[in-house]
Design a protein with these regions (language model features):
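Conserved alpha/beta-hydrolase
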Residues: 9-23
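Alpha/beta-hydrolase active-site loop
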Residues: 28-55
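Alpha/beta-hydrolase fold nucleophile elbow
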Residues: 53-67
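Short glycine-enriched nucleophile-adjacent loop
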Residues: 70-81
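The feature captures the conserved acid-bearing segment of alpha/beta-hydrolase catalytic domains
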Residues: 85-174
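Catalytic active-site module of serine/aspartate enzymes centered on a nucleophile-bearing elbow/loop
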Residues: 176-191
């Protein structure tokens, strides 16, 4: 599915993964300001050089991330809004306000250019929407706060709650891919 989307738009598909060691602090990598953005930019440069497509270091991005990856792609959107075509946040969003319950998470600024980027928040219903207790119950309140802040500033943000899932990705790709496809079609034509 993802490969077909990339081929349709003549895009490169890069799927980095990171397995966090048990009890490690997610913020060390999922907040790109802690240095992971440098690794990403270097990987685009290196992949471009190795593949003979040096333009990879300069092309726009369509970003999708899950959990800490959602926080990360949202953070990259805050840092590089002029490079982002679309951003899909599955079960994780960057914080835009300080949370006294989670002081280790630094809030991001909301640059004006972010308001032009289509962003979709996609939590599972069992992440605080219909199930209010449990390990992932904080996901929906974080998404709701993010949504209200971005939409309140006039941003292009939506919410699509997966009606069947919790923190797993489930079948969310069946909505994410057509949404990103539409964003690519609309926004790439304007570059």
């Amino acid at each position: 599915h993802w490969q077909a989307l990339a081929q349709k738009h003549d895009c490169a598909l890069l799927s980095p993964t990171y397995e966090q060691p048990g009890k490690a602090d997610c913020q060390m990598w999922c907040d790109p300001r802690n240095g992971s953005y440098k690794t990403f930019l270097k990987s685009l440069h290196d992949l471009g050089k190795m593949s003979g497509h040096t333009e990879l270091s300069k092309v726009p991005w369509a970003l999708w991330g899950h959990s800490g990856g959602g926080h990360w792609v949202g953070g990259m959107t805050m840092l590089y809004p002029n490079r982002v075509i679309a951003c899909w946040l599955r079960s994780g969003v960057p914080m835009l306000e300080a949370n006294p319950e989670r002081p280790q998470i630094k809030p991001h600024d909301l640059p004006a250019d972010v308001l032009k980027v289509p962003i979709m928040c996609n939590p599972g219903t069992k992440e605080g929407v219909t199930e209010k207790k449990g390990r992932f119950a904080r996901v929906w309140p974080s998404n709701e706060t993010f949504f209200k802040k971005v939409r309140g500033a006039g941003g292009l943000v939506g919410v699509s709650i997966d009606p069947l899932s919790s923190h797993e990705c489930g079948n969310s790709r069946y909505m994410a891919i057509p949404w990103i496809d539409t964003c690519l079609f609309d926004r790439l034509s304007k570059i």
